[in-house]
Structures are given as C-alpha cells and as structure tokens.
C-alpha cells in the first residue's frame, strides 16, 4: 500500500546522522519522516559511550552552532567531562564527555519527539523508489511505500552487516539488531561504487567484578564545561570518575596465541579495512611489537547500570581468548564479561560519488550521510546528517545547496576530504586535518556558523537572539578594556600608564588580571564566555589575521571556477592518470582540483591556463558565497 501522506524529506535510520538530518529538515519547516527499525534505539550509542575529543569536539560545537541535537543531549547525559589539550593553544583544545548511554538516548528521543514537523515510524526500509534517475520514496518490509521529494539514507553499519566473534559470524547491524540486507542488495544494484569496512568494540565488564584499587583514578575537570552554547552545567547529571589500567606481556602472549582466529588475520575478512586510529587490541599487539603495554580506560556506561566499557581493547578474537587476556590485566583478574567484544563488517559507498551537498551524483534527490560515506564516529556521522538535512530541505524549497568551506568549519574539511580524496579506511576527524585550524576553534563555532544557519532557516530565533546578545556583550567589554587605563605603579615593570587592551597582548596577563589591577569588583566582571573570547582575540590576533590573509590569497589564486561536467581528456598535456581522476571527481573549482591525490603544480597551471582561455566569467549568482554552495 501507499502511505497516505507525501513527505518533503524521508530519513532512513535513527542513529546520530539520521537524528540530525531529520531534525535539521524539520527545523527548516519540511514535513519530515524518520524511518527506523526500532523506535526504542533512536540515538543509541552503539560503541563507546562518549562524545567529543580532538577534532570531534569541534564538530559537536559546529553541530550546536547550527542548532543541532548532539551537544544538547550530551549536556543532559555527560557524567565525566574533560578539556583535552588544555595546556596547548586554543585551536586544538577539545571538549570530551563520557556520557550515560541511557540518559543520552532518552535525551535524543525527547528532542526528536519535541521537534515540530517531524514524524517517526517503525519499519525496516527494504529499497528506494525511483522515477528514472530520481528518487521518489522508499519501500519497506511492511509492504508500505512511503513517498517523498527527497530521501536521506543514514544506515550506519547496518548495510550487509556481519558480526564476528572469532571465526564465527552472524548477520547483524550491531549486536542485538538485524542487518539491512534487502536495502543493501538494492543499493548495490544502483550505480554506486560499493566497498566494505570493518570496525569493532570491546567486551563489556561488570563493574562489581573489577578491583579499582589496583588502577589509577581519573577525575573529570573542574569547572565542568558544557557542549552547547545554550547549555548550563546544572543540566549535567552526577559526575563519576574513570579508571586507567594497562595490558602487559602476558596479555600480548595470549593475543598472539589466538591471532589465527582473528578474522582479519585469518583472511575471513578480506576486503574490509579497519580504523587506523582506533585499532583493535590484536592490531596493536601485532603492529607495535616493541610495546610491552597498552593503556586501557575503564569508562562507566551509565549511572544506573554496572557495565564498564574498557576503551582500548576492542577485539574480534573468540570469546575464549577474550576471557583469558582480560584476566591478565591488572584489576581485571576476576572480571566478569557481560557482553563479548566483536568486529562488524559492512557496506559503504565511495564518497566521491557525492556532491558537496551530500546528494548522490547518480540519483537525484537522494542523499547519503554517516558511515555509509566511509566515516567512523558519532560526531562525524552527526555532522554529515545535519548537512544532508539542510540540503534536502533546500532542495524541497528549490534553493541552492550549501556547504561550508575548509576555512569555515571542520565540517567543511570533512566533506572536502571525503569527496575530493575518497577513503578506503574509516575516516575520523583530527585537528591536524585542518590547515586553517586557528580559525576553527571550539569557542568560535557559533561566530562562524550561527548567522549562516539562521539565513538558511535551520537556526531558530531563540539561538540567534542568544548569539546576538553574546556578541554585543563581547563588543561592549572589548570597548571598555580599550578605555580602561592601568596606572604604571599597579604592575611591576610597567613604565607608563597603559590601556588594559594593550596589556592583554602579554601572554601572562588575562582579562581577570587587568580587571583586578583596575580594582573592578569581581561581580562586575563579564561572563566567562565573554572573557574567553576577549582573551583569545588578544593573544592570537596577529596569528589569526595572518591566517585570514593566507585564506584570502589562496581563494584568489584558486578561485577559478571549473565547468561541471567536463571532459578532462580535452586538456592537452594532462597525464592520463590525472585526467582520469579529474574526470571522476569533477571538481567545481581549482581549489578542489588542487587537493586531488597526485595533483601537481604543473597540472594545476595547465588547468588554469586552459580554462581562462576557454571559458567565460561566471555570473555573481554562480560564484556562490557564505550561504551558497553548488546548484542542487
């Protein structure tokens, strides 16, 4: 049967990407339907119960700046908070929260159910409905066809998922949930380049069987941070510590003994690549022979359960091996395993088959987001879902698509890396991937994106009002500091009266220090958020200005637009290899072409000369801007 309503946007999958996609489209006023195998698992944390970290925390802040869900849910669920790289510069400092997975899922569910224009329906999607090369809806296991103007697929690890514990495997999307086999088969029949990836998870352990006295205690940071710009520490639940222990040579000996029963090493998983930056414990042991131990973080999964997530020992080894090696670890000698660790192998599609809006090139109005595009991690998935939701809504309204540049957002770096270079191993975000990371700090994500989001329609008036108030407060406090004169006798080494704004350029002096020198009462200080902005601006102003100048120069040199589509075999002098890569990627400007693997300065010069000679200047409407990406 046909479902009686026509939707603007259908989102397939209720994980982190799906939730952000559905909520973004709904915030923009689209009648949106979220389809999920199980309503009870919306927002479920399938692996590590944590949000944020290096690069990942930046993505969470950007999601929040665009009025997304993840930061707000984490603020309601975070039970252990830390600021990573606190002693380093502001650009690489990152927030990380250990989340109560029960509270997190409940918070996400509440935000989804509160969202206007969003409907949820429980069914397994079995295929997509096409009219020629345009998607018009999806089919389901209940023999119900759902029709929509756009469709976003956020299937996570469920496409053709196989779960391995040793050499034995069973079909599943994650432990306890079925794989989307029929949908995977239907998608493989379409003109998408299909590959396989593998990821894994560690055995879970009963906290009551752990001797924490033999481990190092790791407390959270004080004062407690928040993820959302609208957040408040009063939303946080009770805080608890994590603990640290290590593997040892006995652990490693057992892993080597069973290595021929690890599916990757036995050749059972042949064509799937695992995550480079989150290797299994067997990979660590086999790749790093000289290391006699590896760190393990014992992370509580919830305030209301006894399960512990031992971060650092994800595995595909048989359960017998898991029992043996866990019992060699200090503090885990009597550990009781509640769930075995496992590896999961699943389908993904080459992201080079996507436009920057995350619409597929092969099927009009069909968008992919999350692990289906070759990424790993909740944050990377959520960020893609948000972008796909925005662009699906823009398509519904017949508006041009949007995506951020590399100098605007880590989301821009993520999308550009995927589409320009593709990936064969699970892609995760790091600050090191961003060449303009001084501009892409956690603290200024709202300044980079909130106003743009408001213009696009995905940021609500309440957030925009709060953002405007913050920026007004920053401007007012900055002006006051420019007028505040500090007498020379108030500070050792000061030879003349100096304005506070000048003193702030010194690395050892911050806003609170100059206000104290001026005898300003503490209750008259600006908010912590405002003080942070002023301190960073004062300390890094020269570096930030230099990076803006570098960006402007780069944009000028590489702003040459390229026609899409174009036959690059016409460009005389290009190597066959580069012509083939350009033909596949179809870069929209010289900047994107420059990042294609194997591109040379000589080849870029050829392209620049060729297109300046053979193409007409683009109109202003075609050049794009802060809120314009490519035509959908």
Curated annotation (Swiss-Prot):
Coiled coil: none
GO molecular function, one term: flavin adenine dinucleotide binding
Key words, A-Z: Cytoplasm, FAD, Flavoprotein, NAD, tRNA processing
Localization per record: Cytoplasm
Family the UniProt entry places it in: Belongs to the MnmG family.
Function: NAD-binding protein involved in the addition of a carboxymethylaminomethyl (cmnm) group at the wobble position (U34) of certain tRNAs, forming tRNA-cmnm(5)s(2)U34.
Record protein name field: tRNA uridine 5-carboxymethylaminomethyl modification enzyme MnmG
Organism expressing this protein natively: Dichelobacter nodosus (strain VCS1703A)
Gene: mnmG
């Amino acid at each position: 049967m046909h479902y009686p309503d026509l939707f603007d946007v259908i989102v397939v999958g209720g994980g982190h990407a799906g939730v952000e996609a559905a909520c973004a489209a709904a915030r923009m006023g689209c009648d949106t339907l979220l389809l999920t195998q199980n309503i009870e698992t919306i927002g479920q944390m399938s692996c590590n119960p944590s949000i944020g970290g290096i690069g990942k925390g930046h993505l969470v802040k950007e999601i929040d700046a665009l009025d997304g869900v993840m930061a707000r849910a984490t603020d309601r669920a975070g039970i252990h908070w830390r600021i990573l790289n606190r002693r380093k510069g502001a650009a690489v400092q990152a927030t990380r929260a250990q989340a109560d997975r029960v509270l997190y899922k409940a918070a996400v569910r509440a935000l989804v159910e509160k969202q206007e224009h969003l409907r949820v329906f429980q069914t397994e999607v079995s295929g997509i409905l096409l009219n020629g090369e345009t998607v018009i809806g999806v089919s389901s296991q209940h023999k119900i066809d759902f029709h929509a103007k756009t469709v976003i697929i956020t299937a996570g690890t469920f496409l053709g998922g196989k779960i391995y514990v040793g050499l034995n495997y069973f079909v599943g999307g994650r432990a306890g949930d079925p794989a989307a086999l029929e949908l995977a088969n239907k998608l493989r029949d379409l003109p998408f380049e299909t590959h396989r990836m593998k990821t894994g998870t560690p055995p879970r352990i009963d906290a009551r069987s752990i001797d924490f006295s033999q481990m190092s205690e790791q407390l959270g940071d004080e004062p407690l941070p928040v993820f959302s710009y609208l957040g408040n520490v009063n939303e946080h639940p009770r805080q608890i510590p994590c603990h640290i222990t290590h593997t040892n040579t006995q652990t490693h000996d057992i892993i080597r003994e069973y290595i021929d029963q690890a599916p990757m090493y036995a050749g059972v998983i042949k064509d799937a690549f695992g995550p480079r930056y989150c290797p299994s414990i067997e990979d660590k042991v086999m790749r790093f022979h000289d290391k006699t131990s590896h760190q393990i973080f014992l992370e509580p999964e919830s305030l209301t359960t006894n399960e512990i997530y031992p971060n650092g020992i994800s595995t595909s080894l048989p359960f017998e091996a898991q029992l043996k090696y866990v019992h060699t670890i200090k503090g885990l000698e009597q550990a009781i395993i509640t769930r075995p660790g496992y590896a999961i192998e699943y389908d993904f599609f080459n992201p080079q088959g996507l436009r920057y809006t995350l619409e597929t090139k092969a099927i009009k109005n069909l968008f992919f987001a999350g692990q289906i595009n070759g990424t790993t991690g909740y944050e990377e998935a959520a960020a893609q879902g948000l972008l796909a939701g925005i662009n699906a809504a823009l398509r519904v309204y017949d508006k041009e698509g949007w995506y951020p540049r590399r100098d605007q957002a880590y989301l821009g770096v993520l999308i550009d890396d995927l589409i320009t270079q593709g990936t064969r191993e699970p892609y995760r975000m790091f600050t090191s991937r961003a060449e303009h990371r001084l501009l892409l700090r956690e603290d200024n994500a709202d300044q980079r994106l909130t106003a743009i989001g408001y213009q696009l329609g995905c940021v609500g008036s309440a957030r925009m009002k709060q953002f405007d108030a913050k920026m007004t407060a920053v401007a007012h406090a900055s002006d006051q500091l420019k007028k505040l004169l500090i007498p020379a006798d108030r500070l050792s080494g000061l030879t003349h009266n100096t304005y506070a704004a000048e003193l702030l350029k010194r690395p050892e002096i911050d806003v609170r220090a100059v206000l104290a020198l001026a005898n300003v009462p503490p209750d008259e200080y600006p908010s912590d958020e405002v003080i942070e902005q002023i301190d960073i601006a004062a300390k890094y102003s020269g570096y930030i200005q230099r990076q803006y100048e570098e960006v402007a120069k780069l944009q000028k040199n590489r702003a040459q637009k390229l026609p899409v589509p174009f036959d690059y075999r016409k460009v005389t002098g290009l190597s066959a290899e580069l012509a083939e890569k350009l033909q596949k990627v179809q870069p929209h400007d010289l900047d994107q072409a420059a990042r294609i693997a194997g591109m040379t300065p000589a080849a870029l010069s050829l392209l620049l000369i060729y297109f300046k000679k053979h193409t007409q200047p683009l109109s202003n409407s075609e050049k794009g801007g802060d809120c314009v990406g490519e035509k959908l």
